[in-house]
Curated annotation (Swiss-Prot):
The gene is engB. Its cofactor is Mg(2+). Mg(2+) binds at S36, T56. Necessary for normal cell division and for the maintenance of normal septation. One of its GO terms (molecular function) is GTP binding. InterPro entries: G_ENGB_dom, GTP-bd, GTP-bd_ribosome_bio_YsxC, P-loop_NTPase, Small_GTP-bd. This is Probable GTP-binding protein EngB. The lineage of its organism: Archaea, Methanobacteriati, Methanobacteriota, Thermococci, Thermococcales. One of its GO terms (biological process) is cell division. Keywords: Cell cycle, Cell division, GTP-binding, Magnesium, Metal-binding, Nucleotide-binding, Septation. It comes from Pyrococcus abyssi (strain GE5 / Orsay).
Amino acid sequence: MISFFFKLFQKFINYTDIPLLMATIVFVGRSNVGKSTLIYRLTGKRVRRGKRPGVTRKIIEIEWKNHKIIDMPGFGFMAGLPKEVQERIKDEIVHFIEDNASKIDVAVLVVDGKAAPEIIERWEKRGEIPIDVEFYQFLRELNIPTVVAVNKLDKIKNVQRVVHFLAEKFEVPWDEIDKTFIPISAKFGDNVEKLKNRIYEIIRERRGQRE
């Protein structure tokens, strides 16, 4: 009975109304998937961004409500940059996350919900592990709680189909899909509050495990 009421309480609680001690939240994703726009929607603070892929090329830290937001450079294709430079940036992202894994409370992997299925299938046809899939697995191997923000909700015709496709490729159990994938529109703000609540929920779970 107690468990039932606790779950009911969790369903209606707004985690953003409850203060938290400083948490570190890392945003990662391919270039030009909307990370900086999403961070602006969440925090009200602008990060340098643009239409050319790869505008954010340095690690950017933002203080927000006593928390630390880390905007990682986009990985993958970056306009005007040689392949070796792109690989070096990816390596820097990997090393930073590996070195700071114990300090990271939650990672938000932002994917382009409209383009991701086609990109993933293209990589698989080449016999390669899609970079979005590889990065999700990398975060999980480091035991960093990860939520996937499926961006550009406003451009997706069948959201459920895309989410289930990603869940299969990311090897996420069916009973964890709703907690792992949050379809959003960073451009229009759709479901951003839901994502924020999920981030806070993960932080609380993380803090409980550390106590």
